[in-house]
Amino acid sequence: MRQPGRFVSRLYYAWGVNARAVCYGAMLAVCAGPALAQSAPPNPLLTSPLPHIQPAPQPQLGAGLPNFETPGAEGTLPNAAIAVRSVTVVGATAFAPARLAVLTRGLAGQTVALQRIEAARLALLGLYRGHGFILTTVSLDIDAAGNVRFIVIEGRIVAVKLSQSIGPAGTMVLRFLNHLTAERPLNEASLERWLLLAQQIPGIAVHAVLQADSDDPGALTLVAEVSKQDVSGLLTADNRGFKDAGPVEALAVADLNSMTAQGDQTEVSLFHTEVGTDNFGQVSESFFIGDRGLRLKLYGGAGRANPRGTLGAVHYESFITVFGGVLSYPLLLQRNQALDLSLHFDGIEDTIHIAGIRNSADSLRVARFAGQYAWQDLWAGNGREAQSVLNLQDSQGVPAFGASPDGRTAPPAGRADAKMDFWKLTGSVSRTQTLFSPFGAATVALRAEAGGQYTTDILPSEEQFYLGGSRFTRGYYSGQVVGDKAAYATAELQLNTGDEFTLFHQDIALGAQFYGFYDWGETWSNLKTDLNHQVRSAGGGVRLGLTKNLEMDGEVVERLTTQLEPKVTGTAPLSETVIYWGVTARY
């Protein structure tokens, strides 16, 4: 099933989340003083900006999988009847004889119309197909004496080959696909799982072709048409940052793909703002463990922020170090649905200096358990495809392995009364639903998303929920409004258009997504001295796909909430209208 629309809402606008939010919060603290209750967003670069910067990979459900026809009658049968002497089913191993006999009952010893015998054949075939045995065939043989034989050929894969050598990475492809040779008959769910897993090997593209063996009915050879991209990359920039740390910001990512037989990926990420006020770098290494799909990612990074403006005047600097690991496993991986589970352990070391003196320090150790379920459906009818994604993450602060103790004073915590052994639950659900086609290949779709965070604890600044960015509550930089608890909702109406053609022997794919949106978000603080906020915005824009590797975006937003701080603080309201741009190039 094709994903609704040519584009999806980008997650990578919302970068530099912490880098910007921190500047804002510290500015309030410096300028307003302790007498006024403030909503103090985190200081710059309190945690890695990368989760808020990089485009989140969209579930590629069913990509590259072979399609199988629905079984039907093989031709028009003559209007005749025969005297059936006996009925046998030959070659069936997947089901007990008693189960098969139910489908052929009433044929033997009777004069039966050919259409009824054909119906029994289709019932046998339907039994196999209904259980996912899509490579199985059932044929019919009737001899002159009236003996009826249903010949079942249970399709199976006996060998897997690669179309070309791709170095050590080919070993990982074969480890996955060779699982298919152990099943007889072959189940569609298994075929889809192992093919989709092979496609998740970094830098590897896989397309399956099945070849029949003329000497062995039912025996198939799977030829994996493979290609490999050793190096891939991403460069993206926009103007959504906080003014004293941007607002122009950029991210460069370089990947070295599958250089060993473990399907590894080495990734280097560099985040940089307009005049170098915020800089962050991270290196990660990921690889498969075994041949079932379990994957481990290890990472480490560091950054520094020294914003301009009021914070620059007091010589504000923040330093961050992050490290950790992620174990992920695809529990369910099929053509139209996928369920991924992951276990995370994150370490964050954050220090803030003002005028060269250490002002606060936090050391966090956090265990997280996360799940993502994605599915495609046709609930609205044929031609109205939809894709939905549900995300849940449970996080628990770990008061060990070097974590800061609660209630410390030297140096103090970055947020008063914050609990290092906190608990929180974060989640979101989104759906992009195709509505209709107004003309040609164009489609109109509705994208809706809702989500938020719940906790009963006063969270460290690094773990508060950030509103703003490019995916929801647009018009505010990511982290401009934060809270221990939060909720948001967004609705976006999209007009998707596109055209593909060849120019100078190059395939060109042009596309445009015009959209209008309305966003709402609200935060609640468990710290009584912090403010709660509600923000709303509306606007529209266009996402232009100039080639398959280059996208340019423009957006106009009307802020419906402009006064984020009490007027008594003297904080000026935000401007009502703001214009954003973005560009992304992939290699």
Model regions and ranges:
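Repeated loop/turn-to-beta-strand initiation elements of outer-membrane beta-barrel proteins
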Residues: V206, V231-G233, T260-T266, D291-K297, ...
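Outer-membrane beta-barrel "beta-signal"
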Residues: A254, L544, V556, P573-Y587
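C-terminal outer-membrane beta-barrel translocator/porin domains of Gram-negative envelope proteins
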Residues: T351-W520, W524, K567-T569
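Residues that define the transmembrane beta-barrel architecture of outer-membrane proteins
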Residues: G218, G246-A250, T277-G281, F319-F323, ...
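Periplasmic polypeptide-binding modules associated with outer-membrane biogenesis and secretion
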Residues: R2, Q38-G241, V253, F271-H272, ...
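Transmembrane beta-barrel domains of outer membrane proteins
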Residues: E225-S227, D238, D255-N257, S284-F288, ...
